Amino acid sequence: MRLETDEAFRRYADRVYASAFSITRDPTDADDATQDTFLRYHTRSDDFESEAHLKAWLLRVAINRAKDLSGSFWRRNTTALEDYMETLEFQAPEDSELFRAVMALPEKYRVAIHLHYYEGYGVDEIAALLGRRAGTVKSQLSRGRALLKNALQEEWNDDES
C-alpha cells in the first residue's frame, strides 16, 4: 500500500506535526521534523502493509527526527509555548489549560500522553512506536495522568483564590 506524497501529507501532516511538537515544544523544529518526515516518505520506495502501518511509520520517523532536533546544540533556543498557543484554536478554555499542562510534562510522559489521548493509540501500539515495553507505557500514562491531575488542581485552586 502506498499513497502519493501529497495525499499522505494531506491525511497525516497535522498528526505528524503534533507528535513532533509534543517532543520539541518549538513550532519551527516541529515544522522541520514534519518536512523531514515527508521527505523521507517521498524518497522511500517500499510499500506499507496497511494504512495503519503507514501512519505508525510516519509518526515513528517524526518522533525520531524531533528527538534529534530537540537534542541539537543549535536548537536549544526554543520559542515560548505562549507564542505557539496563540496560533492554536481551542474548543473550550479548559482545552488550552490542559494542552499547556500536557506540554509542561517531562518528555517521557508527554509523548505517551500525546500518542494515547491525542492520536488515539493503544498501549501496545505506543510501546511499538517508542521501542518500550507495554508495562513501561502503562506506567508512563499513569504517572503522566497523576502529574496532570496535580498540575490542573493547583492551577484551578489558584484561579479560585
Each language-model region and where it sits:
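DNA-recognition helix of helix-turn-helix
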Residues: 63, 67, 130-154
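Acidic, proline/glycine-rich intrinsically disordered inter-domain spacer in sigma factors
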Residues: 7, 76-103
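C-terminal edge and immediately downstream basic/flexible tail or linker adjoining helix-turn-helix-like DNA-binding
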Residues: 3-5, 78-82, 92, 128-129, ...
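Short, small-hydrophobic-rich alpha-helical interface motif
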Residues: 16, 20, 30-41, 61, ...
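A short, charge-rich alpha-helical start-of-domain segment used by transcription regulators
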Residues: 1-18, 31, 42, 110
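Sigma70-family region 2
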Residues: 36-53, 73-74
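Arg/Lys-rich amphipathic alpha helix in sigma70-family domain 2
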Residues: 49, 60-81, 91, 143
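A short pre-motif secondary-structure segment
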Residues: 112-116
